[in-house]
Amino acid sequence: MKHKTFSLLEKIEKKKIEKETIKIKNIYLHKKKHIKQLKLLSGYQQEYLRKIHDKLILGVSVHQWQNYNSFISVLEVIIQDNINTIKKDEKIIQESFKIWSKNQIQGNIWKHLNMIHKRKILRIKKIKDAIINDSHIQLKFFKKV
């Protein structure tokens, strides 16, 4: 029964490790997507800042300036949201790595205990086989005598 328990616990830890690995991969891809989006949005922001600067030098109506300014403000909010999402993803990745590492250690412990228990069972089986074999030989000897 204990043999099955150690084996079962080892399998559970392996499943936890697989689950955490998939989670890390998905969060990493999510973070990568937001980094790419952040670069794109920052590029747009720089482009519009250059345009408004050039138009301010050449002269721009108040209405156009307000439109550019509103758009740049919206971009800043979206950029900040992306930065916050990237930071949140990074924290989740770090926490997931800690959990993954803990599960790895726990899995190795259960694996080690499982191997020790298997060796112990094998040793007990060999002893029982030797006892049965010795009893069988003694029984044959007594029958001859």
Swiss-Prot record:
Keywords: Bacterial flagellum biogenesis, Bacterial flagellum protein export, Cell membrane, Chemotaxis, Membrane, Protein transport, Transport. It is found in: Cell membrane. Pfam families: FliJ (PF02050). GO terms for cellular component: bacterial-type flagellum; plasma membrane. It is a peripheral membrane protein. GO terms for biological process: bacterial-type flagellum organization; bacterial-type flagellum-dependent cell motility; chemotaxis; protein transport. It comes from the Bacteria. Belongs to the FliJ family. Flagellar protein that affects chemotactic events. This is Flagellar FliJ protein. It comes from Buchnera aphidicola subsp. Acyrthosiphon pisum (strain APS) (Acyrthosiphon pisum symbiotic bacterium). The gene is fliJ.
